[in-house]
Amino acid sequence: MRKTITALAVALIATSANSETIEQRVAPCLACHGEKGQSETENTPSLGGQQAPYTLIQLFMFREKLRTFEPMNEMAKPLTDDDLRTFSDFIAKIPKPAAPADAGDPARLQRGQALVQQHRCDTCHNPDLSGKENVPRIANQREDYLAKTLAEYKDNSRHGYDASMAEVMAPIAAEQIADLAYFVARMR
């Protein structure tokens, strides 16, 4: 079923390149990543407010299969360089996801905040973790996606264009990842 949906989405993107607006072309992306930029799909990142240069790099990597996740590789395959820039610029203008309404567990928030400070996440991701240029916005990202991604950096199974996250995650204990993701997902 997922392959069928992906194939239909790819066909829609490829055939509509010249006749549809960017809003129409991005609709298949937002079906998984959230219509308003806030994903409701498990382990799927929210794209709202993401840095355009970061998104451009990720889309390029998916298109060229330098980053592998088959649905995304297929979706990005027909996109031209201009398409990648257009999609990235559009995504950057979608409002970033809001923090969850509940205040959260104070002890977990405190542990997560201490990890953010100790490992200086703000150095690359900005004090509000909004990201900059080719560094992603991680504030208010889906907690499950953050935990999965951080664990992949820690075990070196996620490779990007930059090895710095593997180095950052090396000293962080596996059991601390949940608190780190919990805090970052609830940034206020």
Spans of features found by a protein language model:
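Protein kinase-like catalytic domain
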Residues: H33, R63, H125, K154, ...
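Hydrophobic h-region of N-terminal signal peptides that target proteins for export
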Residues: I5, V10-N18
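Sequence/structural segment immediately N-terminal to covalent heme-attachment motifs in c-type
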Residues: N18-Q38, A99-P100, G104-P127, R142
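C-terminal capping alpha-helices of c-type cytochrome domains
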Residues: K77-A99, D144, V168-R188
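Gly/Gly-Pro-rich "capping" loops immediately C-terminal to redox-active cysteine motifs
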Residues: G37-R67, N73-L79, Q113, Q117, ...
